[in-house]
Amino acid sequence: MPWVPREHSHDDVQLQEFSRNFPVGRFPYECLEADIMAKIGLEELNGLEMEVMRRQMQMTSGRLHILEDQDATWCHKEAALFTLLVSVCIANLWLWVHW
């Protein structure tokens, strides 16, 4: 199939802007936080900003804890359902052979 150039869209312009601003192979989100911290510097953060960041970390950690608990619960349910399915299949096979 021959290569057909496509029309440029608004997203292409944004992508070109990002590619000029960032090194090759790196995405904007990979270095954005590090760049901000390098520009601001830790010593310039006041108590309010530190408190806001601490609360955000607590919220994120809490959400992660909830997701980990849900994952553990799901794994237990999945194992129980798989065991039930295998048991029903074995019982069905046994009944089929003995009839």
UniProtKB/Swiss-Prot annotation:
GO biological process: apoptotic process; regulation of apoptotic process
Membrane-crossing segments per the record: 79-98
Keyword ATP-binding: no
GO cellular component, one term: mitochondrial outer membrane
Keyword Membrane: yes
Organism superkingdom: Eukaryota
Subcellular location: Mitochondrion; Mitochondrion outer membrane; Endoplasmic reticulum membrane
Alphabetical list of InterPro entries matching this protein: FATE1
UniProt keywords, alphabetically: Apoptosis, Endoplasmic reticulum, Membrane, Mitochondrion, Mitochondrion outer membrane, Transmembrane, Transmembrane helix
Major subcellular site: mitochondrion
Membrane topology: Single-pass membrane protein
Main function: Involved in the regulation of endoplasmic reticulum (ER)-mitochondria coupling. Negatively regulates the ER-mitochondria distance and Ca(2+) transfer from ER to mitochondria possibly implicating it in the regulation of apoptosis. May collaborate with RNF183 to restrain BIK protein levels thus regulating apoptotic signaling.
Quaternary structure annotation from Swiss-Prot or TrEMBL: Interacts with BIK and RNF183. Interacts with IMMT/MIC60and EMD.
PANTHER family linked to this entry: FETAL AND ADULT TESTIS-EXPRESSED TRANSCRIPT PROTEIN
Name of this protein: Fetal and adult testis-expressed transcript protein homolog
Organism name: Mus musculus
Gene symbol of the encoding locus: Fate1
